Amino acid sequence: AIAVCDSYMRRALMADSLVWVSSAPRTVASLPYISERTRSEFSYYLSQVDEIIDTGPYPTHEIIRHFRFISAVTGATIPPEAPQITWRDQAPPIDAGAPYVVLNPGSNEPGRRWPLAGYAALAKTMRERGFRVVFVGRVEERSGHEEIEQAILDAGETQGIIDMTGKTNLPELLDLMKHASLVVSNDTGPAHLSIALGRPTVVIVGGGHFGSFVPYPQEVTPANTRFVFQEMECYHCFWRCHRRANKFQIFPCIGAIAEDQVLRACDSLLKGDEERRAEELYFLENLMAQISEADPIGPARVEMRMTEGELRPIEFK
C-alpha cells in the first residue's frame, strides 16, 4: 500500500496529516506551495514521508502537476491529457423543448462572481437567438435568486428562462450540462465538470493564482473551451486583493471582464455548432432533391444517422 499527497495548493492539516496518520508502508508527497506562514508545518510533515516529488514551480497547472507526479511514482512517462468524464445518457431535469444554454453565476468565493447584470444580458442575447436559458447553482446561492430575477427583468426577457438554482443534485446538474448547447460559468466546480463532459464551455477567470487551475495549458485545453480574462498588473495576488473594500466585493480582475468579451467567446463556440447544423440541413435538402428527381412518382424517404459528427443516409425506402 502507498499513501500519496499530490496537490500543490493544499493545507497541511487537511492533506499531509492524513498521509501521516495512514501508517502506510510507503508515503509519497509532492512539494507544495510554501509560504513563510506555512513553512514550519509543511517542514514537519514533509520530513515524515518517504519520498518528496517536485512537480514544478508556481504557477505550473495542476493537471500538469498530477501527470508529473503519477509519472514519477510509476516510473513511466505519462503525457498529460485533457480531463474527461464518461457520464450516463439521461434526459435533463427540465421539459423538452428548444436547445438551451446553462449559466452558472455562483461561486463559493463571492469575489469571483461575474456581475449578475452580465449574466442577465447574456441570457437576453441567448433568448434572442432561440436558445432557452437555464440558471444553475447551489441551494446556498438561492439568496441571490431575487437578484437574478430582477436582473433578468431589467434585461427585458423572462420567457424561456428556467431557474434551477438549488433544484438539482450533482447527477442532475451533470445531466443538464451534458445536453446543453453551451455552458457559461464562473471559475468554480461546475465549469471543470462541463469541460470534462466535453460540452462547449466558457469560463470567466480572475487572476488570483492565474495558470494554476485556470486557464488550462494549451496542450490540455479542449477545442470547445474558452477562458475569458482581463489581465491586470496585480495578477497572482493569491486572492489577497488590496483593491476591494471588503470580502464580498467582486475582485476587480473579474469585474473588468466586459460583457462583449464573454459574448465573443460564446459566439466562437456557437458559431461552429450553427454552421454544422446549417451544413447538415443543406446536405439533407440537396439529397432529398436528388431523390425526388430520381423518383418522380412520389416523395422518397431516407433514414439519416449521425456518423462521426456528420449526417449521413443509411437506408432508402
Predicted features by range, described:
Residues 1-317:
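Catalytic machinery of carbohydrate-active enzymes
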